[in-house]
Amino acid sequence: MRLSNDQTTLRSEFADDPDMVAIIALFIHELPQRLAAMHVALAAADHEQLRMLAHQLKGAAGGYGFPKLGEAAALIDQAVNVGNDDNVIRSRVGMLAAIAARIRP
């Protein structure tokens, strides 16, 4: 996955499911806090915390119908697991944040 200038709005694959609307909205509402926690972990060089947060987001994003967000979180999880340097990890967190910024209900 590459970071691009794509500004296309991302909606959940389940956005038209009335049973999912409220929980998707909650997921989107809580997404900034998840990203903030990841930035705090990155700034503190707490790679284990960052890996855990990315792993959790990877699963949640897929479950709420945001596969691109899940793929970006998986890349962070992978980068930490294989011991990539902070520049690679920081780049992947930036990519995740850019994708998250495109998400709408």
Regions found by a protein language model. Name each.
Residues M1-P105:
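Two-component system phosphorelay core
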